[in-house]
């Protein structure tokens, strides 16, 4: 709303002007230098970082000390902003997030602290962890990676966790229940032949007329290999029971490309330079920085620039982290062997 936007602009201006380049006195840590910066605002929330420094040395303040100072200054800033608002309007301190990952508008994750800097819980919004059309294995894998990043901030450990998860998937050790997706069947589809679980319900009805799922029933299905690449979704899914009875092959590549990959591309794309650093690919980092400068010079609209950057980073992450597993699945399906097999 217009009022919400005005409040965000007001809070941004107040905090950045008052704490933008200021030495502040704190209760437990004496004087600290603030370089407050607006991060994100939406409807009735606004996010800032204080970019804390030692006022004498200029050294950045991080970790637990930064968390404690931020909680104190954020409450102070909220009270200051409220003084100049007409009641009942107020700017209320809600939470401090450390670490904090902002993926896009209304999509973020972080360790949430309120007033106690020693009591934090993981908070996420708008992520695939909550989507009903996500299988449990995505939630397990994504959640495990986020847990590593939130608690240890170790990107290499997060990548190793991803690799182990992908290996477990393609080796067939993931329980089918973890790959199943459940959707409710309705009776009012405009184009029912394009609705995968409706087509599956029809197939079940033909196989067993007395047990055709009815509108309102929740249908559980798993994706299976179909050699026809143009096949519609209804011909790519089956019930877990039918898969076991007929020894069908689960389509693991679908779970990588359509379930795991997209949300994880976006997440790891934010750490692309760190990944290249671990792999000692300095040339890739130089090329990336050059490409980003060129992109920034050709696109003036910030939102469009961020979308193009995300697309660029996602493609690089696919190559770095996912392609070797997709190739392995393809080889197993076609009977091809890698050249290393001949020297094993």
Kindly label every feature range from the protein language model.
Residues 2-43, 48-344:
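DNA-dependent DNA polymerase catalytic subunits
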């Amino acid at each position: 709303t217009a009022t919400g936007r005005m409040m965000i602009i007001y809070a941004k201006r107040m905090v950045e002007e008052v704490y933008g380049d200021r030495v502040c006195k704190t209760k437990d840590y004496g004087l600290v230098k603030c370089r407050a910066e607006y991060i994100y605002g939406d409807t009735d929330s606004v996010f800032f970082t204080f970019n804390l420094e030692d006022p004498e040395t200029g050294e950045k303040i991080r970790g637990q000390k930064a968390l404690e100072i931020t909680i104190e200054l954020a409450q102070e800033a909220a009270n200051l902003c409220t003084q100049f608002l007409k009641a009942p309007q107020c700017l209320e301190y809600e939470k401090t997030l450390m670490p904090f990952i902002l993926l896009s508008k209304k999509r973020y994750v972080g360790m949430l602290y309120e007033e106690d800097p020693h009591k934090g819980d993981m908070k996420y919004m708008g992520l695939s962890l909550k989507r009903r059309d996500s299988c449990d294995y995505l939630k397990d894998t994504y959640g495990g990676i986020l847990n590593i990043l939130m608690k240890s901030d170790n990107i290499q450990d997060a990548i190793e966790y991803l690799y182990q998860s992908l290996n477990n998937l393609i080796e067939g050790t993931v329980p089918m229940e973890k790959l199943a997706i459940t959707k409710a069947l309705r009776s009012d589809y405009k184009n029912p032949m394009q609705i995968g679980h409706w087509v599956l319900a029809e197939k079940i009805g033909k196989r067993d007329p007395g047990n055709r799922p009815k509108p309102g029933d929740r249908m559980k299905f798993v994706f299976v290999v179909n050699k026809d690449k143009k096949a519609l979704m209804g011909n790519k899914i089956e019930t877990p029971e039918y898969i076991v009875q007929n020894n069908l092959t689960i389509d693991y590549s679908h779970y990588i490309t359509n379930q795991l990959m997209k949300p994880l591309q976006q997440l790891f794309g934010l750490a692309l330079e760190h990944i290249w650093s671990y792999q000692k690919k300095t040339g890739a980092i130089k090329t990336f920085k050059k490409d980003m400068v060129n992109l920034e010079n050709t696109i003036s609209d910030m939102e469009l620039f961020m979308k193009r950057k995300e697309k660029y980073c996602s493609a690089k992450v696919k190559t770095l982290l996912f392609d070797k597993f997709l190739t392995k699945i393809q080889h197993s399906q076609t009977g091809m062997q890698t050249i290393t097999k001949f020297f094993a």
